[in-house]
């Protein structure tokens, strides 16, 4: 019997960076105001690229040296797809020539990558099989650029992993996927009209968030799902090498570390440079750490997300 493992990670971000000072030219804000509240200094904005373009770049990097025909599954976690249909994953499939892959998008907002990784691990049962799990977002197309409470938070980007079913021992050790639909009103984007014939299709509703309620939710529920995940695996908090949290707000990450009574050094952050990239953030962070040699084979890692739904998720993996 063989088991699934993360064989490779990758990321892709536009080179076009927008600083806090740049934003202060178009809205009432400042570098100090943004950094103090979020830890964000800059974010990447994709000017001429769709979500699928970012995901395709990641997929091509992940499949370098691999046979695309051997890919069984492609999941793209996103809340900003190119279109309602076709799925972004189908566009990725066509671009990389993975003609044998089942393809679909998964929408769980900023928990999406952790959700998708868990789904892929459970679906990938063929020995030697491969899956692409990608988080990709172009949230710059969804935010209201006159609303400083949300526009300053988000950036565009993509990250992903190649999952292979070829390990001789389990690498995906436990997971917790939670949803709290009664809290849905606190974070929303892209609503369509409830009327059947409202006239021509217009722009989707912009991103809206009750920041205070989301902060309270994240700082309470993320420690809960992480603790439950580790209890399921029989692993202690101190045994984990890295906690890769959704990069929404530096203050949230610090507070989660504090609630778990763990050193902040175990909770790396790159939000200062990239902002909140939603479903892409954990994958981007993992790929960046792997490139720097800070996340290595054998490391015990928790991936955790939280976001719209509201949702919270944690996955314990051995790299």
UniProtKB/Swiss-Prot annotation:
It comes from the Bacteria. Residues 247-251 are annotated as: ACP-binding. InterPro entries: ACP_syn_III_C, ACP_syn_III_N, FabH, Thiolase-like. It is found in: Cytoplasm. PANTHER family: 3-OXOACYL-[ACYL-CARRIER-PROTEIN] SYNTHASE, BETA-KETOACYL-[ACYL-CARRIER-PROTEIN] SYNTHASE III, CHLOROPLASTIC. Catalyzes the condensation reaction of fatty acid synthesis by the addition to an acyl acceptor of two carbons from malonyl-ACP. Catalyzes the first condensation reaction which initiates fatty acid synthesis and may therefore play a role in governing the total rate of fatty acid production. Possesses both acetoacetyl-ACP synthase and acetyl transacylase activities. Its substrate specificity determines the biosynthesis of branched-chain and/or straight-chain of fatty acids. This is Beta-ketoacyl-[acyl-carrier-protein] synthase III. The lineage of its organism: Bacteria, Bacillati, Bacillota, Bacilli, Lactobacillales. The gene is fabH.
């Amino acid at each position: 019997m063989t088991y699934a493992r993360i064989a490779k990670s990758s990321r892709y971000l536009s080179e076009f960076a927008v600083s806090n000072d740049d934003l202060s030219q178009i809205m009432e804000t400042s570098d100090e105001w943004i950094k103090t509240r979020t830890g964000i200094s800059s974010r990447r904005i994709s000017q001429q690229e769709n979500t699928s373009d970012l995901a395709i770049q990641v997929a091509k990097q992940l499949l370098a040296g691999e046979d695309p025909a051997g890919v069984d599954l492609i999941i793209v976690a996103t809340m900003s797809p190119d279109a309602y249909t076709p799925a972004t994953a189908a566009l990725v499939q066509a671009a990389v020539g993975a003609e044998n892959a089942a393809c679909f998008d998964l929408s769980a907002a900023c928990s999406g990558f952790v959700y998708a990784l868990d789904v892929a691990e459970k679906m990938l049962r063929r020995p030697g099989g491969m899956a692409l799990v990608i988080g990709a977002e172009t949230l710059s197309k969804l935010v209201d650029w006159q609303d400083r409470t949300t526009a300053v938070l988000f950036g565009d980007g993509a990250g992903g992993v190649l999952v292979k079913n070829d390990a001789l021992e389990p690498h995906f050790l436990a997971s917790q996927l939670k949803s709290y639909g009664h809290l849905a009103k606190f974070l929303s984007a892209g609503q369509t009209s409830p009327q059947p014939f409202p006239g021509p299709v217009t722009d989707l509703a912009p991103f809206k968030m009750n920041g205070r309620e989301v902060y309270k939710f994240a700082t309470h529920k993320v420690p809960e799902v992480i603790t439950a995940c580790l209890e399921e695996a029989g692993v202690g908090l101190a045994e984990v090498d890295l906690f890769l949290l959704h990069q929404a707000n530096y203050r949230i990450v610090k507070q989660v570390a504090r609630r778990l009574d763990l050193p902040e050094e175990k909770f790396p952050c790159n939000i200062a440079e990239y902002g909140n990239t939603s479903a892409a953030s954990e994958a981007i962070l993992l790929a960046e750490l792997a490139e720097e040699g800070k996340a290595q084979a054998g490391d015990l890692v928790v991936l955790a997300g939280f976001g719209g739904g509201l949702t919270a998720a944690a996955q314990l993996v051995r790299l």
